[in-house]
Amino acid sequence: MSLYKPVKIGNLELPGNLFLAPVAGYSDKAFRSVCVENGACFTYTEMVSAEALIRDNWKTEGLMARAYNEKAYSVQIFGGTEDVMQQAAKIVLEKTHCECIDINCGCPVPKVTKTGAGSALTRDPERLYKIAKAVIDVCQDVPVSVKIRSGWDKNTMTWKEAAQAALDAGVKAITIHPRTKAQAYE
């Protein structure tokens, strides 16, 4: 019995369920290409700063480049406000023609969370909803997903509320990193 099964994310139909997760510093174009060669049917870029995108940072744009053998991939963006995330989503769609946009709600790094982005969004479901809705509003037929953590710390396990906010906004898939922000990369 094969564990490899087709998956549907919104209107995106994928031939299999072997995905490469978005990991900052690791899921660059070259690594994604190697993973596709070894069976991954869907990949995510490492997280891309929405602020850097709207400021036209060429290095940031390079993070979004599709590998030659990627048939389907998602660009993951992070930011703390609806306006910036919506503008960034427009740029991603114009420059990449990716099959999905993923909202990072999992990064535990203080320079990200202090701006209200990354795992700070898991702690604030209302803001997560607003950001997801703003991104979805510009994506039209391109599905939007989110990656969340289980919570802020062991006393603030907010994954259910965050997931529900994302679903209420209309996201088509949710990835859960089963550690809290406080656990970081333990």
Model region roles, listed by residue range:
Residues M1-E186:
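Flavin-dependent oxidoreductase catalytic cores
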